[in-house]
Amino acid sequence: MDFQNPGLVWGLYAAGLLVFGILYALSLKKAGLNLLCAPLSAVFGVILAVIGARFFFLVPNLIFDGGSLDADTLATLRPDEMSFTGGCVGFTFGVFIAAKICRTEAKPALDAMALPGCVLIAFARLAETGIGFINLGEMPAFLPAVWPFAILNGWGLPDFSVSTLMALAALLCALWLALSKKPSAPGYRFESTAFILCSVMLFLEMLCTTSSWIPFIISFIHLEQVLCAIILLILMIRRTIQIKKAGPLIVTALLLGLNALMQFVQDKPYLFPLPEDTDIALLSVIVFALTAAGLIAAWFWAGKTQSSSVKGS
């Protein structure tokens, strides 16, 4: 794999796994769970993360773009031909398998993994700045054109690293988890983390102007956004079944629809009767940010509804 700064990439990956292992072991110890889950999760997680990242990239491309599977295609590990969200799904399955091997309940193990997982995501996202050609956007004038905010492109000009924002979002989520002491049902901590990160990812993906990492499915929707939307719907459907109220799910579906509509407006503004002086880029940022905030609010609305139901019973 041809990286712009291979030392930075592999160094951050290694550091991320080391920090993950330490934090996960501490979380497992605090929860009274088997400490062996930590090293096993790292091993199985990395293996399944690579498989998941490749699988969730290949399958949609085969469906929408055609092509065939062969040995060379399967063995290709180009970073622009892998899905970060798919990698996260694969890593989660690795943690699940490790918990089963250690005869540990999966939900508490995943809850214990939530904070260390956020830190690992932050390291992995920051490592993308060393790859050099993925998750790039237009450089904002108010930010310094230096690493980790800027990456020099092939013409020696700075591009904005959206991966850095994604890393910061993961760290903020980790901070929230560290400060959150409120007890919750098994699995809720992990599911909340996944929902928040996918909601933020849905927003930040729209800042990417490069499509090498995320192929387009319907000319204006990124694959990563589709995967995040599917995860959001699955999590909210599970929550809706538990609380037996459809309100949060309806809000989630409407917000995802609004997100897709705004993507279409951004791609083909001439099809919509907007004022001539409308700043499409600014409008998109506002709508996508509000959509992400609305999705997170809907999730905690569902969680509050579940808590009220438990108290009432």
Predicted features and spans:
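Hydrophobic, membrane-interfacing alpha helices
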Residues: M1-S313
